[in-house]
Amino acid sequence: MARRPRSSRAWHFVLSAARRDADARAVALAGTANWGYDSDGQHSDSDSDPECASLPSSIPSAVPVTGESFCDCDSQSEAFCGSLHTAHRGRDCRCGEEDEYFDWVWDDLNKSSATLLSCDNRKVSFHMEYSCGTAAIRGTKELGEGQHFWEIKMTSPVYGTDMMVGIGTSDVDLDKYHHTFCSLLGRDEDSWGLSYTGLLHHKGDKTSFSSRFGQGSIIGVHLDTWHGTLTFFKNRKCIGVAATQLQNKRFYPMVCSTAAKSSMKVIRSCASVTSLQYLCCFRLRQLRPGSGDTLEGLPLPPGLKQVLHHKLGWVLSMSRQPPAPSPAANGPEPRRCQRKRCRRT
């Protein structure tokens, strides 16, 4: 029988839910009777089948998301090289990584066993060889009163059962699903998670929230404990308010992944009190949404401009207008902009 091409086999296995791997590792381990393979680059046995396996995925999980990068670097536009689970290892893209001070980094003491930290604990890598479940990690700082903003950059191909960015309380068990492929963030009332498929998860429910994101995408998160809102950004443009009524609650920034050899990096983490200065900068950005430099042309002392850029640069640079919906054939349709406008009352 003629051998089917690799790309054809991958699509066939995804659509038929066959549990096989397209990597060469499958050949080396094919003699092991009790193991199977799936599209996350995972070894899978009877206790590591994905929950909700009967539910259709919004995009084929074996195929990495492309075309959603913040920049046009070659290393971001080239997804996989050689096989579904061998990432293109070109020069690391540093676009969007201007910050030098970070309010928090990833916590080496509160993470799943299948994680590895690097870059001064700002970059987390998941499932270094293969995956047998879901790995997660949280930040070093519990976020309480004030304004909190951070950005996570997808530094590897994005694929698999799920890769998520979100928040959760101290009650979230990060290692609970280390033998289960699932969307960990948002499975209960203690966490919210935005999936790379564009689905928002909370209390076990899924809501179509945005277009998908992939390698090179920058996902921003704004936790406003004054107004009690959680807002997500994609490539520094607002995509919507995900949660409200979060006043007087404390959360940790969290990410999770089921994909083998996947990674994410904190490129910005900052905090501010909800002061008159913050509210003024926020209002200025609303009044000048299309300006590259919100303070440009304003009659302010140079020293004050420098202080504001240093302390509240993220407020002055973010686009608060949600993007217009685009007819994406392979992704969930975003909700109407009118229902997701980032405004304060």
Swiss-Prot record:
Residues 38-58, 320-345 are annotated as: Disordered. InterPro entries: B30.2/SPRY, B30.2/SPRY_sf, ConA-like_dom_sf, FBXO45-Fsn/SPSB_families, SOCS_box, SPRY_dom, SPRY_SPSB3. Residues 263-314 form the SOCS box domain. GO terms for molecular function: ubiquitin-like ligase-substrate adaptor activity. Keywords: Nucleus, Ubl conjugation pathway. Residues 84-273 form the B30.2/SPRY domain. It is found in: Nucleus. PROSITE patterns: B302_SPRY, SOCS. It comes from the Eukaryota. Transmembrane segments: none annotated. GO terms for cellular component: Cul5-RING ubiquitin ligase complex; nucleus; SCF ubiquitin ligase complex. Pathway: Protein modification; protein ubiquitination. Pfam families: SPRY. One of its GO terms (biological process) is negative regulation of epithelial to mesenchymal transition. Its main location: nucleus. Substrate-recognition component of a cullin-5-RING E3 ubiquitin-protein ligase complex (ECS complex, also named CRL5 complex), which mediates the ubiquitination and subsequent proteasomal degradation of target proteins, such as CGAS and SNAI1. The ECS(SPSB3) complex catalyzes 'Lys-48'-linked ubiquitination of nuclear CGAS in cycling cells, leading to its degradation. Recognizes and binds nucleosome-bound CGAS: ubiquitination and degradation of nuclear CGAS during G1 and G2 phases is required to promote low intranuclear CGAS abundance before the next mitotic cycle. Belongs to the SPSB family. The SOCS box domain mediates the interaction with the Elongin BC complex, an adapter module in different E3 ubiquitin ligase complexes. Substrate-recognition component of the ECS(SPSB3) complex, composed of SPSB3, CUL5, ELOB, ELOC and RNF7/RBX2. Interacts with MET. This is SPRY domain-containing SOCS box protein 3. It comes from Bos taurus (Bovine).
